[in-house]
Amino acid sequence: MNKVLEVRDLRTYYYTYEGVLKAVDGISYSIMQGQTLGIIGESGCGKSASSQSILRIVPSPGKIVGGQILLYDQEHPEKEPQDLTQMDPRGKEIRKIRGGRISMIFQEPMTSLSPLHTVGNQIMEAILLHQTKDRKEAEERAYEMLVKVGIGNPRERLQEYPHQLSGGIRQRVMIAMALSCHPSLLIADEPTTALDVTVQAQVLELMKELQSELGMSIQYITHDLGVIGEVADYVAVMYLGKIVEMGSLEQIFRNPLHPYTDRLMKSIPSLRKRKDGRKLESISGTVPIPIGIPPSCGFAGRCPVRKSGKCDCAVPKLTDRGDGHLVSCFLYGDEEEDSVEIPKPKRKKWGRSEG
């Protein structure tokens, strides 16, 4: 299988008046053709910031301060990969990639779709930008995409506005928009969170069918472990801007190594727990704001098995425990992460960070 995307030591920081907020703090991973990588973690762990970094849509005052995001050409594997971090976030080069080679499905379609434009015009926009300049051809492709995602009366739907559609249909429209140019990578940022359970199952099944048909890769972001169990091949667990554990779906779900991953798994409802009368276990405390945190394991303050004098004084290195199962925890070794100096932001005349 060919590599589609490789992220190397990515760091995305927000320079605020309170200090430097490390939303993404040195993560690395790869996605192969046709694979699904699930990224899980609580809110505030950096999942969405990592995906925004890939598309170079990090909102101000955020800034990519280090690392590489390498996008490989699937049609010409012999070509050198493009480093997206070196592109102007507002430039023509990255605009050719957004919606073309990389697409994204957002969490809430009602706030992502324009209320002023018809469904047809919004799907056609990406097609006209990346595929063809012929409006009739673009409209026909938009129609075909609505058929592909299972929307009834597609001709009529093309002329309707988002507020006229149900939540499930709106999310199918978002999927149609994202896949209209046949991207090699689809980023799905909690696309089923706002949907009821029945519609959620339908959308997940639809995405799996389309992935099999189109051969694309998916980066799926969610805090719902049940969803990840349905769609992912590999899983990365994020906490406080770092990947603390990564491996195959079976490795993460059957043999979680990091205390944070273990606590997440124990919080999943199951019929067995209900039958045995066991209560769901929760994780004490909340995810801290990643500003001014001294060098330490980010989970140390909430960890029931932390080593005093070690976990609260140094950052564990992400190491391979065998068969590609990576974990960042002092329970499995004493390797420490190298310290990194925080880059100073470039300032414009009016004192704001550059985008």
Describe these PLM feature segments.
Residues 180-184:
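A short, proline-enriched helix->beta-strand linker immediately N-terminal to the Walker B motif
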Residues 56, 187-191, 195-278:
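P-loop NTP-binding/switch modules centered on Walker-like glycine-rich loops
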Residues 40-41:
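The feature captures the beta-strand-to-loop junction immediately N-terminal to the Walker
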Residues 1-4, 13-26, 57-62, 75-80, ...:
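A short, flexible loop at the N-terminus of ABC-type nucleotide-binding domains that lies
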Residues 77-82, 249-355:
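Charged, flexible cofactor/metal-binding loops and thiol motifs
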Residues 136-156, 265:
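Conserved ABC ATPase "signature" region
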Residues 160-165, 169:
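Conserved ABC ATPase signature
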